[in-house]
Amino acid sequence: MVCKHFGSCGSCALYNQNYTQQLQLKEQRVSELLSPFYTGELELFDSPDSRYRARAEFRIWHESERCDYAMGNIEKKGAVTIEECPKVIEPIEKRMWKLLEKINASQEVLKQRLFAVEFLATTTDECLVTMLYHRKLDEAWSEEAKMLERELNCRVMGRSRKQKVILSDEFVTETLEIDGKEFTYVQYESGFTQPNPAVNVKMIEWAIWQAKKVGYGDFLESYCGLGNFTLPLSHYFDNVLATEISKRSIHAALQNCELNAVENITFARLASEEMTEALNGVREFSRLKGIDLKSYDFSTVLVDPPRAGLDEGTIELISNIDNIIYISCNPETLARDLETLIKTHTVMEAALFDQFPHTEHVESGVFLQKK
């Protein structure tokens, strides 16, 4: 990927290395962190070099009468205006510059106190644009935004403090082919989604390969989000219990279950710590009413925690389950958690998923089996 803003825009910190070099550095970093626990081959899953990101946020920089997109400066001092962003997927690219033209052509209605624009797009050319303001949005804004929807063939939302204006919908619908099957996902504007669709598919398929090695019992998932892993993996287990703290994500997960005609998943709105308390019989939760936890016989658990990794209670809980699929967005906390998990389990497989090319961020996964 080549970008005229390499060296000034802070979005791509590894701009001075080609993609192969970047991947080698990430492989070295993850391999070193995992070396006390795993001596096998680290499987690498690369990304497209450009046009890979389906979610993006840009600041709006006001200069005289004009607005421009801006990103944080690479030196973390101020911002730099941008004229291109080759990492966003085509459904964003083809709309973002037309949108900027419309904003600048507007008689203040669209540009007044606009401070950021967010894009959420799909590989099937759907796109949701969220415009963020430091002012209350009125009917005049709604009318111009409706014109944007028609002209850009996308969905437009407006947000300001304690205000959300939905003109048509607040979601997009993605369809991905995973392990030879099509899966449809409703993705909401404020919900978490994996930003790199191509690598996301590889990541889910890797988890499926591990699940196929088990081939029995029930499946437990923590941090399930909108069902990204849950739906495809549900085909390889008898019953599934998936937990997530976000109301919006649980709502999306239930919709996605229905869209994909999956009937063996039960979703529960619980934090990871609460899931541990419930399964250990420490606390009862009204949110689990009608769910017989004792009826499950979990053979496999998948965890995909935030950067902080797993809490001690969750580690203790999953250490009692035969097979663990651990997806991590922070290899340092993954290594920390493995120090405990290898007391009961052996790391059988490890993988690196390059969700974030041109940055130092890296996603990884390990598959563990009970000793």
From Swiss-Prot:
Reactions catalysed according to its record: uridine(54) in tRNA + S-adenosyl-L-methionine = 5-methyluridine(54) in tRNA + S-adenosyl-L-homocysteine + H(+); uridine(341) in tmRNA + S-adenosyl-L-methionine = 5-methyluridine(341) in tmRNA + S-adenosyl-L-homocysteine + H(+)
GO biological processes: methylation; RNA modification; tRNA processing
UniProt-listed Pfam families: tRNA_U5-meth_tr
Residues annotated as catalytic: C329 (nucleophile), E363 (proton acceptor)
One Gene Ontology molecular-function label: tRNA (uracil(54)-C5)-methyltransferase activity, S-adenosyl methionine-dependent
Binding site for S-adenosyl-L-methionine: Q194, Y223, N228, E244, D304
Keywords, sorted A to Z: Methyltransferase, S-adenosyl-L-methionine, Transferase, tRNA processing
Entry EC number(s): 2.1.1.-, 2.1.1.35
UniProt entry tagged with the keyword Methyltransferase: yes
Domain of life: Bacteria
PROSITE patterns hit by this protein: SAM_MT_RNA_M5U (PS51687), TRMA_1 (PS01230), TRMA_2 (PS01231)
GO cellular component assignments: cytosol
Signal peptide span: none
Membership in a protein family: Belongs to the class I-like SAM-binding methyltransferase superfamily. RNA M5U methyltransferase family. TrmA subfamily.
Function (record text): Dual-specificity methyltransferase that catalyzes the formation of 5-methyluridine at position 54 (m5U54) in all tRNAs, and that of position 341 (m5U341) in tmRNA (transfer-mRNA).
Protein name: tRNA/tmRNA (uracil-C(5))-methyltransferase
Organism name: Sulfurovum sp. (strain NBC37-1)
